[in-house]
Structures are given as C-alpha cells and as structure tokens.
C-alpha cells in the first residue's frame, strides 16, 4: 500500500498541486477520505507502511481509487466528462514538455474508461510508470556520459 500512497503523492505533485499542505488547507484530503469511507487511522497506516512491502496494485481497494479521483476533482483538474484536463493543469502551473507528453500518452490509453475511479487509478499508475521509465532513461544517460569521460 505504500506504493499506492506514493502514487497518490506523485499524482498530486504531477498535476501541479504544490504540496500536501495545500490539499490539507483546503480540506481536500479530509473531504475525500470521508466521502470514500477511509478513516484517518487507515490513511495514516497507509502512510506509515514499510516501503519494502510489495503492493498488489491490481487488488487495490476501490475506496483508494475513488480517493484519487476525488482529489483530482476537488483540485479542479478534470474536464466536464471527468477526465484529466491538461490545459487546467497548465493554468495552475506551467507543464513541462516531457510531462505534457506523458499526460497525453496516458490520456490516449485511458480517456475512454467509463468508471471514474478506475480511470483515476489507471492514470496515476500510467503516470507513475512513465516517470519511472523516464528516470531510468535519464539515469542510463548519466551513466553513459560518465563512461565516456
């Protein structure tokens, strides 16, 4: 579940909501926890989990998937159909070309998903995997440059 928590944090960061404190100030987290029947204790347990635990993302509790959608919705990051709106994100804070490409690539795959909770979760997973791959490519490039020196 720690990976799920990290995915949530990454998503919030990716979609340009600057910090968890901003979410807390606007009560987004509390509101979304309550609307998805997630207790503060469950949320804290999710945060405190050991990072070495393997997560089975396929079996993620629907409440957490809907929690992610709720955060995006309350953050005004969705279009009228409930899908991520890159232009709205860009208005909050300019999006880099790399992030824009990743967002659109994930949207191409998942924007037909009718279940908004599943959509939000799949988008977060796609974004996370894309960033992991991007980081691996960047790291490989750095290592190649060091070898060439």
From Swiss-Prot:
InterPro entries: PBP/GOBP, PBP_GOBP_sf
UniProt KW Glycosyltransferase keyword: no
Organism placement in taxonomy: Eukaryota, Metazoa, Ecdysozoa, Arthropoda, Hexapoda
Biological role stated in the UniProt entry: Present in the aqueous fluid surrounding olfactory sensory dendrites and are thought to aid in the capture and transport of hydrophobic odorants into and through this fluid.
Coiled coil: none
Disulfide pattern: 32-70, 66-117, 106-126
Signal peptide bounds: 1-16
Family as reported in the entry's similarity comment: Belongs to the PBP/GOBP family.
Any Gene Ontology biological process: sensory perception of chemical stimulus
GO molecular function annotation: odorant binding
Name of the protein this chain belongs to: General odorant-binding protein 57c
GO cellular component: extracellular region; extracellular space
Organism: Drosophila melanogaster
PANTHER family attached to this UniProt entry: GENERAL ODORANT-BINDING PROTEIN 57C-RELATED, ODORANT BINDING PROTEIN-RELATED
SMART domains given in the database record: PhBP
Keyword annotations: Disulfide bond, Olfaction, Sensory transduction, Signal, Transport
Gene3D superfamilies with a match to the protein in the record: Pheromone/general odorant binding protein domain
